[in-house]
């Protein structure tokens, strides 16, 4: 009994102290190692801030058609883009609403984009304003809305996304972006006179700044007729003559970003020499999001070039065969 008691009263305090020191030391070492691993992992997964990058990235969303079909695929696209840390701006090229630009569609669109973690710029498409909402929204009827109904829907677009104006401008990485909303009362993808006047004014102010125009409709003749309506009046930016004259008078415009024609990345017209308008302005066509396989284009804006990269969201991979390099004009 005495030996046992002696071990507990004399030997135990020192042993316990040594054991305690050892435990604290091991815990400190473990914590230090974990902190170091977290630091290394964070450094490898993060992206340099914009001030340290050589480029700015603008991600283009083709016609979202919200809520519409394949909503789960659209939400996966948003989650993927949210995970890209080098995104400076996300642009949606019109047809934000699925069909008629109803209040319910605008509510769904606002909810969708509120969960985007990057700055957003949008323009209108024909489905956002031009069609009259039928008594049965599932009827599939498409008739021009009255001027009053069109104006109400354009105002709803403006208010829903808190835009400075339906058409607006923004500088990104030394490039001027002009976001032009379709607002013509007759053409499906038309620019009304007041918007054309705004465009002329903006371009006159920036005659020596490389400029990119974002508009829902493509430029005429920049696609092969892979569908019967391609290059027809209701499928190209209107008025054709006014648009052509505007571009001819402003050599600083070198890129035109569009949607509307639902051009998939598997179509030859998606990335082709035919995309060059009047030998000078490259039209970048974008796939709609109303499908299981969604592609998005990214514009990587360098001081001396724009690299266009295409991402297949179903495969979770970039498609290097579609990569293009476009040089801005020099003044």
Task: Give the role of each language-model region.
Residues 8-19, 25-26:
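Short, low-complexity, charge-dense intrinsically disordered segments
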Residues 45-108:
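N-terminal active-site segment of His-dependent metallophosphoesterases
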Residues 60-62, 90-95, 120-126, 180, ...:
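Active-site neighborhood of phospho(di)ester-bond hydrolases with catalytic His/Asp-centered motifs
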Residues 102-206, 242, 248-252, 266-309, ...:
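Extended active-site neighborhood of metal-dependent phosphoesterases/phosphodiesterases
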Residues 28-39:
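Bacterial N-terminal signal peptides
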Residues 190-192, 206-257:
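Active-site-proximal segments of metal-dependent phosphoesterases and phosphodiesterases across multiple
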Residues 56, 88, 167, 174-175, ...:
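Alpha/beta-hydrolase fold active-site loops
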